[in-house]
Amino acid sequence: MLYAGLLTAVFYLTFDSSRGDEINQLNDTITSKVSSDTRIFCTYSLSSSADNAYLFWYKQTPGSSPRYLLHRMKASTDELRSDETEAMFSSQLDTSQKMTSLTIVNTQLCDSAVYLCALSTTVLSLHYCLLQ
């Protein structure tokens, strides 16, 4: 097989423009060599009313639903992941460049999939009801 040593991943755009928030993947397809590290990039923009953003990464294999891998919050340096997400996946967030990336360490053929980035914004407000 000619391409047995290559990984091909296809990426789709996911965005939420209802409030002026948007996320875009920089490449439609990335080809990597087996055992190398692969990095996937998304840029985002937030409306002026969006104080915080959650940037998610999903993996979808043929015939399956997207599987949540991990996410980062713009206002935090913590990376949150599902219990099943392997240590080979990590994400980075550069708020000055408005960019997030997913790194796949030691890429293997079984990592061939569609990887999706997604953006969700929240408005945090607290409501109190005082009772006497």
Predicted regions and their residues:
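Generic leucine side-chain signal with a strong bias for well-ordered alpha-helical environments
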Residues: 7, 13, 69-70, 102
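Small disulfide-bonded, cysteine-rich extracellular recognition modules and tandem repeats
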Residues: 26, 45, 60, 69-72, ...
